[in-house]
Amino acid sequence: MKNKNILLDTNAFIFLMRNEKESSNTISLENRQINESKFYDECKNANYLFITSQTLYEIFWQSIKKTKKIDQFAYYYDQIIKFKNKYNVKFSILNDTDGEFELRLFEDQYKDNKVDINHFIERKREYEVKKINELLIKVCFSITEFLAEYYGILLLRNFYYVAGVICEIKLNEISYKYYSDLKLKNEWYDKEIDDLFNFLLENMISYIEPQIKENGHKFPKIQNVKGTKYVHKLFCKLKKDDKTVFEKYDNHLKGLVEELEKMGMSKNCMKYWIRMCRRCVYSGAKIKKNDGLDYSIVTCMDESIVINKTNNMINTNDIIFVTFDTNLYNFSKECDVLYSKKFYDNLMFEYR
């Protein structure tokens, strides 16, 4: 009986298509290996299979990056059609309202062998910048706002606006360079993002530090680290004099959630960036290029920002999110976003 609706992230989708091609896969989660045949059976017996527009953009880009051609993307595109027809599975693409993959345009151009590669890469780039910018600003602002509140300082709202504009301009410069040079690796992009985060943070702290001193407080000096590592070390140093500083930051985040809920921000979006904030403060985890992609995937079920290609409304309670990426899996599990323990337990072999 076809009764499951499954949302595949990028690597789960590629895993499925390669399995169809009978390639060898060795993927594991929580030290348990994925049972390929069970995963394949679940997908071919699903009611609906979903992927997001950003998965298509990512596969399109990887095809260009590896071969300078769309052949690999075309293969996966053809595999979707074959899979649908072979198993009578409904296969739909979830598109963010501002990040839709223009599938009809691609199909028309593909038939004529005239795919405008630059157009699709630019669409991916623009949307990616928007998502990474959103994460950077939210994480950076949550930290700066907390520090201002912690030391009794009032921040003007125009301060946020200016920082947001600067961040977007610099991110565009970084992404233009990355997507113009096929030799550049994700590690280069990630380093540039961390440097940008550090730039924003330094400017924000330089803005509030004089006011902290005016209020009679001493701001901790942190040396030899920058970016998210600086943030983690700063909080660890604050903890020496205030054992509850991490707890206070968590309470600050809860206050932001309440404020953003009133503004209509979706719950999945908030869960993702709050987890990102906490990982940054608690462990110094960096914001990376792929976080923008992950962010768009995990928030794609929010009805206010999604366009789906199905005829009926999608009940998110009936959807299972499948990912074999450790970070995304942990997010889905920890935050209970489209997570099914029973489904994953069925997919995996016993612990090694």
Regions found by a protein language model. Name each.
Residues F321:
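Conserved SAM-binding loop
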Residues K2, T10-I307, N311-N317, T326-R352:
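Active-site-proximal, substrate-binding regions of enzyme catalytic domains
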